[in-house]
Amino acid sequence: MRGNSFRMLPFLLGASTAALAGPPFQTDDPEPIDFRNYEFYTFASSDGTPLETDTAGPALEFNWGAAPNLHLHIIVPAAAIFPADGPRAFGIGDIELGIKYRFIQETKHRPQIGTFTMFEIPTGSAPRGLGVGKTWYKVPLWAQKSFGPWTTYGGAGVTVFSVPGYRNYPFAGWLVQRDFGKKWTLGEEIFYHGPEGPLAPQTRPSTLVDVGGYYKFRDPGFQLLFCYGHSAVGQTENYAYLGLYWTWGKKADTDKPGDQDKPAAFRSPGGRGQSSAYLP
């Protein structure tokens, strides 16, 4: 971020995450990975305005299905900032921890609903602009429904700061994606965030339109994730994500409603954190 701040990116996602649902999109979803399953990502992402471009990468993300309907999440990013009128900086960014919990299951006529609370730990250098300097939070609510090869999900939340120069701001997004054969899944999202404060590059609201998806090298265990988007309304902003995804673990006993034709681990890679949901 400009001055003593840093804006870490997700994904699409989503939000990163999320999985894609989450990575690579900025909008996230409520679906945790299966119990006793694991996900690993390595990725790079970028978010830029006329004031500054912030990047993450290489970054590492790990998700663990710690209990039914709940997974734990961590991202450790290398970070870089490129201000339009100041010195560049490189180093470790703020580490992200998260808990995704689904409290309403999907049925034939009802979407699944859950939350993905995130805690950004101040490991990045605030004086160099690679971190905020204090722990900050994301508190969202997400919903998802599947119809054959189609899946739609979205929701809204608030990012909470306690640091001068930053302000609490709302965010919201919605995405539609479709499977094309056995290899491709493509989607498009609309994602909004409010102004983030005078120390952030995102000083005004912005609404972005992002397009991306996944290519399965091995179904479902190894995938390529990609996304690019640009603002349609508000402050000029660009978003990009490119990553690799692996999943492994105990096979789920039963498929979730609406997902009978999809491998358990592929239903939605991860759950967007800095990698797939939108973060400052």
Regions found by a protein language model. Give the residues of each.
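Transmembrane beta-barrel domains of Gram-negative outer membranes and organellar outer membranes
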Residues: A21-P280
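Bacterial N-terminal signal peptides that target proteins for export
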Residues: M1-L9
